[in-house]
Amino acid sequence: MIENWHRGFVLHRREYSETSLLVDFFTEEHGRVTLLAKGARRPRSPLKAVLQPFTPLLLRWSGKGDLKTLTKAEPASLTLPMQTLALYSGFYVNEVLARVLENQTAYPELFQHYLQCMTRLATQPKQIEPILRTFEFQMLKALGYGVNFSICAATGDPVSPSMTYQFRENQGFIASLLQNNYTFLGKDLLAFEQLNFSDKATLQAAKRFTRMALKPYLGSQPLKSRELFQSILPNKLKSS
């Protein structure tokens, strides 16, 4: 039984019976946890207004089985003010985390990166793409996706900014004479290593790489947040 307060955010919620919710949280000490929020769908439930995305929460839960019960949830601060593109980008981040995080596995450093990501989305709406790419690289590192962007995987030589490298899953980047969807310029790889996405071409290459690297974690099922983005803002999907 867990009695202490824990910091967390709502990642996803779904109906459970006529009056309750199952809620996926991302917590600082326990990673992703799924809790039963009893009565949270009732009109007068204090949980109804509290269990919203992008609100920093203090949580308590109890129980001995796999599915534990949320006993208390309070806002730790005001909801982060997401607007339009930032809002859908935040939903995208939440959906990806809900899919890729192991249940009840702590990711304390990633939790801090998530908090920074959400804060930046709320306060820097013109920097959405660099913010998302930065978090995706941080997330891949937290998941154990060990790619060295500064070393050629075949030779061990330092990556040259002027050369082209082909990405090979489970191996890394090797020097290549080819140019296709799996190849990247050395200068871009070195920028990836530093999380430097100030160059537009590097930013586009980073998006191509993260889509490629996240695919094994996300599977073939389309992201609902991306579909929603396409239907509502078809001309601005580039932001996610």
Curated annotation (Swiss-Prot):
Under the cellular component aspect of Gene Ontology, which terms does the record hold? Answer: bacterial nucleoid
The protein's UniProt keywords, in alphabetical order, are: DNA damage, DNA recombination, DNA repair
Query: InterPro entries under this entry?
Result: ARFGAP/RecO (IPR037278), DNA_rep/recomb_RecO_N (IPR022572), NA-bd_OB-fold (IPR012340), RecO (IPR003717), RecO_C (IPR042242)
Q: Which GO terms describe its biological process?
A: DNA recombination; double-strand break repair
Q: Which SUPFAM superfamilies match?
A: ArfGap/RecO-like zinc finger (SSF57863), Nucleic acid-binding proteins (SSF50249)
Q: Which Pfam families match?
A: RecO_C, RecO_N
Q: Which Gene3D superfamilies match?
A: Nucleic acid-binding proteins, Recombination protein O, C-terminal domain
- Indicate yes or no for the key word Transferase: no
Signal peptide range in chain numbering:
none
Tell me, in a sentence or two, what this protein's role is. Answer: Involved in DNA repair and RecF pathway recombination.
Query: What family does this belong to?
Result: Belongs to the RecO family.
Which protein are we looking at? DNA repair protein RecO
Gene behind the chain? recO
